[in-house]
Amino acid sequence: MDRCCQRATAFACALRPTKLIDYEEMFRGAMQARAMVANPDQWADSDRDQVNTRHYLSTSMRVALDRGEFFLVYQPIIRLADNRIIGAEALLRWEHPTLGTLLPGRFIDRAENNGLMVPLTAFVLEQACRHVRSWRDHSTDPQPFVSVNVSASTICDPGFLVLVEGVLGETGLPAHALQLELAEDARLSRDEKAVTRLQELSALGVGIAIDDFGIGFSSLAYLPRLPVDVVKLGGKFIECLDGDIQARLANEQITRAMIDLGDKLGITVTAKLVETPSQAARLRAFGCKAAQGWHFAKALPVDFFRE
């Protein structure tokens, strides 16, 4: 008896944002994309669910902060000359009781909108400074520093300078062991309030870093205007070091030029999102001083640095 078999094939994919540093998050996105294709009727309602979830997160953040649901993990920053840890970037996580561990991309924009950015930053600063002070008490050379991400709006908050001074005083951390990492923002070089605040922080001895330099709003115009100590290169600059030969050669020239410029200006260039041995080797050959990324270590719990 003749029988007819029908088969259907469905394809789905999840895009990987340039700044993504957690492969588990990318895997969850791929699995969700597959589920959406397999059962589109179910996911037709998911847009409404996502709106509800965003609202739920927004309204529950303050309670979560009071309950201690936020915590920090740290991605080591490596000195390329000898592969030793010289510092770490503090990364915020939310251990939600029902949604699991949430990365900042799920809630930071909510914090910006509901006025919780400064309280969250205060939490991160206090925890990070306390942790790195403990590490420094148990390490010899090099003495580690901690890098804390801060938004332009938080920098401009009237109480931010006093907050930083207070945290440094309470924890006993030397100011030079704290680095404030600023996301690219056009306001940084235009807003006199932001420029003045960064100069005041620099006068305290706090390091100033510009994240994802040269990719978005950030440009060479930042350098003479702001007291910059570190610029971070990431995204395509690093990714293309493993690309096809045409893209690789062009990015090598740009990366070399930025490292050379940093040396001439007394600015440390830190490569981020370094994921392969060949990327690390090229950066080392170019004279890059520091790097971070999955090739060296993923984000680690605080206990790792206490061992």
From Swiss-Prot:
Coiled-coil ranges from the UniProt annotation: none
PROSITE patterns named among the record's database cross-references: EAL (PS50883)
Keyword Glycoprotein in annotation: no
Any GO molecular function: cyclic-guanylate-specific phosphodiesterase activity
Keywords: Cell membrane, Membrane, Transmembrane, Transmembrane helix
SMART domains for this protein: EAL
Record-annotated EAL domain positions: 54-307
Its membrane topology: Multi-pass membrane protein
Annotated localization: Cell membrane
Major location category of this protein: membrane
Family matches, as CDD domains: EAL
Name of one Pfam family that matches: EAL
Entry keyword Membrane: yes
Stretches that traverse the bilayer: 158-178, 203-223
A GO term from the CC aspect: plasma membrane
BP term (GO), one: biological process involved in interaction with host
InterPro entries: Cyclic-di-GMP_PDE-like (IPR050706), EAL_dom (IPR001633), EAL_sf (IPR035919)
Protein name as it appears in the record: Uncharacterized protein Rv1357c
